[in-house]
Swiss-Prot record:
InterPro entries: FAD-bd_PCMH (IPR016166), FAD-bd_PCMH-like_sf (IPR036318), FAD-bd_PCMH_sub1 (IPR016167), FAD-bd_PCMH_sub2 (IPR016169), MurB (IPR003170), MurB_C (IPR011601), MurB_C_sf (IPR036635), Oxid_FAD_bind_N (IPR006094). Gene3D superfamilies: 3.30.465.10, UDP-N-acetylenolpyruvoylglucosamine reductase, C-terminal domain (3.90.78.10), Uridine Diphospho-n-acetylenolpyruvylglucosamine Reductase, domain 2 (3.30.43.10). It comes from Listeria monocytogenes serotype 4b (strain CLIP80459). This is UDP-N-acetylenolpyruvoylglucosamine reductase. Cell wall formation. Its cofactor is FAD. It catalyses: UDP-N-acetyl-alpha-D-muramate + NADP(+) = UDP-N-acetyl-3-O-(1-carboxyvinyl)-alpha-D-glucosamine + NADPH + H(+). Keywords: Cell cycle, Cell division, Cell shape, Cell wall biogenesis/degradation, Cytoplasm, FAD, Flavoprotein, NADP, Oxidoreductase, Peptidoglycan synthesis. GO terms for cellular component: cytosol. GO terms for molecular function: FAD binding; UDP-N-acetylmuramate dehydrogenase activity. One of its GO terms (biological process) is cell wall organization. Its EC number is 1.3.1.98. Belongs to the MurB family.
Length: 298
């Protein structure tokens, strides 16, 4: 795998790169090979090479709704953070995979385009948002997604239309088929800028009041179980404030687990498992993780 630096001298590549620098939890082991393409063509080259040489490939977006285990990740990590262009085409916005969702919502505001207000505080990338059909406060990415350009795991380029992008709660065709998002097209509506700003301000205030933004975290840990709210179940189980190592069930919102200092990915995973077990025993409800967990144990 170290041959990648020789094979692709024009692409930024690091070896044994600590991944804790790239996750919102500030945890995670090292990547064997960490690749940062600057263009779609470079991305396609690396994906095709990994497929041809049977090298394990993992895509890393903004690292926000993600836990990387303490043993790190074998093979190649493809970090698409440098693909950040956002453009307007009439009432549509085209954003590349590495663009931040927050920046895309701000771009829409600046262009007086409405539809992405719900995303103004979601700390993910466009690629990650499409992968899990990210949403908040009654809105989801699939509501405004018109099309997406993706790579298959073999390096084949595909343009998917809205009808092909099946989406459900925290699920998408992109995740199901393990596609690599390159860009996304959103269909928005013209609106007065002050009205868009007012909606964003309202959602930002709600987010700041309810979420533990003062600590590193992986965002909402659990999916909403049918007929329940995960945070309420955790709170009613007496787990709010529970600590394992440096990981704590947030005192501000029980649906979040925060790093109060020196947490490891193992602390997070042990606390997640303890919460799931306790809620199962008390309420006979299975809490399914929304956060993605990848990598190897140490």
């Amino acid at each position: 795998m170290n041959n990648l630096q020789t094979q692709f001298p024009h692409i930024a590549i690091k070896l044994n790169e600590p991944l804790s620098k790239y996750t919102y939890t500030k945890t995670g082991g090292a990547a064997d090979v960490f690749v940062m393409p600057k263009t779609i063509e470079e991305t396609q080259e690396v994906v095709a090479y990994c497929h041809q040489n049977k090298i394990p490939l993992t895509i890393l977006g903004n690292g926000s709704n993600l836990i990387i285990k303490d043993g790190g990740i074998r093979g190649v990590i493809l970090h698409l953070d440098l693909l950040q262009t956002i453009e307007r085409n009439n009432t549509q916005i085209i954003a590349m995979s590495g663009a931040k969702l927050i920046d895309t919502a701000k771009f829409a505001l600046d262009e007086s385009l409405s539809g992405l207000e719900f995303a103004c505080g979601i700390p993910g990338s466009i690629g990650g948002a499409l992968h899990m059909n990210a949403g908040a406060y009654g809105g989801e990415i699939s509501d405004v997604l018109e099309a997406a350009t993706v790579l298959t795991q073999t390096g084949e380029l595909k343009k998917l239309k809205r009808s092909e992008l099946k989406a459900a709660y925290r699920f998408s065709t992109i995740a199901e088929k393990n596609y690599i998002v390159l860009d996304a097209t959103f269909s928005l509506a013209l609106e007065e800028k002050n009205l868009i700003q007012a909606k964003m301000d309202e959602l930002t205030a709600a987010r700041e009041a309810k979420q533990p933004l003062e600590y590193p975290s992986c965002g909402s840990v659990f999916k909403r179980p049918p007929g329940h709210f995960a945070g309420k179940l955790i709170q009613d189980s007496g787990l709010q404030g529970h600590i394992i190592g440096g990981a704590q069930v947030s005192l501000k919102h029980a649906g979040f687990i925060v790093n109060i200092g020196g947490a490891t990915a193992t602390d997070y995973m042990n606390l997640i498992a303890y919460v799931q077990q306790t809620v199962r025993e008390k309420f006979d409800v299975e809490l399914e993780t929304e956060v993605k967990i990848i990598g190897e144990d140490k």
